[in-house]
Amino acid sequence: MIKFTLQWAVLLGMVMLNTLESKAQNSNYMYRIAKIKVDSSQLENYKLALQEQMNTAIQLEPGVLSYTVVADKKDPSAITIFEVYANQEAYQSHITTPHFKKYKETVKNMVTSLELIDTDLLARVHQKEY
C-alpha cells in the first residue's frame, strides 16, 4: 500500500506545480497510466528500449504529447509511465506505428506485468518551463 501511495504522490507532484488548467480546456486529451514490472536483470535494456520508443513517438507523432516515467526508489524495476495523447484517435494511431510495435516486440520478455489505467484529468498545474 505504501508503494502504491508513493507512486501516486510522485505523479501528482509532477503534474501539480504552478498553473491550473480545468478539465474542460483539455476535454479531448487522453491521460493514461502504465504500471509496468520489469525483470530486474533486464532493467537497463528495458530503459533503453523505452527511451528509444518515447523519443521516436514525440518526434514523429504530433498526437503524442507527453511521457513522464518514474521508478519506485525501493524497487527500480517497478516503472510507472504517465502518458498524454491529443485524443483517443492519436493513441490508437500510436499503437499501430512501427516504432511502438518494435518496442513491444523488444520488451515482451522483459516485462513481467503490465497494468493500463485510463484516467480523467481533474486538474493540472505546472511551471511554464520545468
Task: Tell what function each PLM region has.
Residues F4-W8, M16-M30, T68-D75, K104-Y130:
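Glycine-rich beta-strand-turn "strand-cap" elements at beta-sheet edges
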Residues M30-L60:
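N-terminal targeting signals for Sec/Tat export/insertion, comprising classic cleavable signal peptides
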Residues D39-Q42, D75, N87:
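Acidic/polar helix N-cap motif
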Residues E52, T56-S66, V84-D118:
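An amphipathic, aromatic/His-enriched active-site/gating alpha helix that lines ligand/cofactor pockets
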Residues A78:
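Short glycine-/small-residue motifs
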